[in-house]
């Protein structure tokens, strides 16, 4: 028996109380100057799972997760334009306590958001070119998800999974030889981390979950595996060939268990710098916070990502926001440009509440932790200019 870490089952909270909390925070946003509309949503899941197999394994497990979010909108009626900004709070493997002060400071974020939105609405459009980027974990988690998480699913690398979001450039012949990123890059898969969306005691093949290396000192060293993929390719953790690392998941009894993503995370440097120190080391750059839209090719290689906030960095200082920013690179180019990773104080566990895979399609939730990080010489596009091409 295994139960995830939470304090208050959100389904024990009345609908009236849930609506009241969402309304309270929404009304604070609407009361601020420059906020013309607010969208609020809360998704909550209670998952009870019983598993038994012919080898004698029997497990009973329960997981709880929530995803609250608020989006503030500014409307410039004269120009016919609008700007929006969403809260940065990630989905989490927590209960109702997450909305009332445990794990996230909603009061602080709701108070700060209108000012950031007003600045964003009046910000100049970015001049495209090469910039040094300091990327906050509220943005970087998504880049990890798309360019590392999906790329290191072995079934995808072998071509078993192609119809839903493509295969992978990280093919089996590159294992142990591909310089995925710079020497400061260390990435793990981990289905045991507290409050992770993919965290559980046993996977859907009865395998105990664990932490394992995917990238070590920049070198590609491991895949995410289920039993079928591990056995067929003589791969596994701790030097033991043919052993799953606990990455099987089915979203319902009516679906076969697929190899699904663990909580794939970039590790901080134990004595790494703060966000302010990372910014202080940049002469001309952009500090990026929050995720928005993205695009990546069918091999998980060529991509572009946007964000919520883009703060100019000039001579080590933030000097106001710009807008219409997307950073573009190939996966290995981008991760090899990572010069510095922040320390544990910059670390945040972000994630995706609904990640799709397979045909028939299945949905899984997965977290991605990371520190803030500094990337040198990344190509930045102006999204408005690109749209006009």
Model-derived regions: residue spans:
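N-terminal small-residue-enriched
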Residues: 1-389
């Amino acid at each position: 028996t295994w139960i995830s870490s939470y304090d208050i089952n959100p389904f024990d909270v009345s609908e009236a109380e849930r609506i009241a909390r969402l309304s309270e925070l929404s009304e604070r946003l609407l009361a601020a100057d420059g906020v013309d509309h607010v969208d609020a949503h809360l998704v909550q899941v209670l998952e009870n799972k019983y598993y038994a197999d012919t080898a004698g394994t029997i497990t009973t497990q329960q997981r709880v997760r929530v995803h609250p979010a608020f989006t503030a909108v500014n409307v410039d009626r004269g120009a016919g334009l609008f700007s929006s900004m969403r809260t940065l709070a990630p989905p989490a493997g927590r209960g109702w306590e997450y909305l009332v002060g445990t794990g996230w400071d909603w009061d602080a974020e709701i108070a700060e958001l209108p000012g950031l939105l007003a600045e964003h609405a009046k910000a100049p459009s970015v001049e495209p070119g090469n910039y040094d980027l300091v990327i906050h974990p509220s943005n970087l988690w998504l880049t990890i998800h798309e360019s590392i998480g999906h790329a290191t699913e072995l079934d995808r690398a072998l071509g078993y999974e192609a119809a839903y979001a493509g295969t992978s450039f990280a093919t089996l012949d590159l294992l142990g030889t591909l310089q995925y990123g710079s020497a400061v890059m260390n990435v793990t898969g981990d289905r045991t981390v507290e409050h992770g969306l993919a965290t559980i005691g046993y996977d859907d093949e009865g395998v105990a979950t664990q932490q394992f290396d995917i990238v070590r000192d920049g070198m590609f060293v491991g895949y995410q595996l289920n039993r079928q993929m591990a056995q067929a390719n003589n791969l596994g953790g701790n030097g033991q060939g043919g052993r799953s690392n606990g990455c099987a998941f089915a979203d319902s009894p009516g679906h076969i268990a697929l190899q699904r993503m663990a909580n794939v995370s970039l590790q901080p440097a134990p004595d790494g710098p703060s966000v302010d120190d990372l910014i202080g080391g940049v002469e001309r750059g952009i500090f990026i916070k929050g995720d928005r839209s993205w695009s990546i090719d069918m091999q998980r290689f060529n991509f572009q990502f946007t964000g919520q906030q883009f703060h100019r960095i000039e001579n080590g200082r933030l000097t106001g926001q710009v807008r219409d920013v997307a950073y573009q690179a190939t996966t290995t180019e981008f991760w090899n440009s990572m010069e510095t990773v922040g320390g544990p104080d910059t670390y945040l566990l972000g994630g995706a509440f609904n990640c799709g895979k397979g045909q028939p399609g299945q949905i899984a939730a997965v977290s991605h932790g990371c520190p803030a990080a500094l990337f040198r010489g990344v190509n930045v596009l102006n999204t408005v200019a690109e749209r006009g091409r």
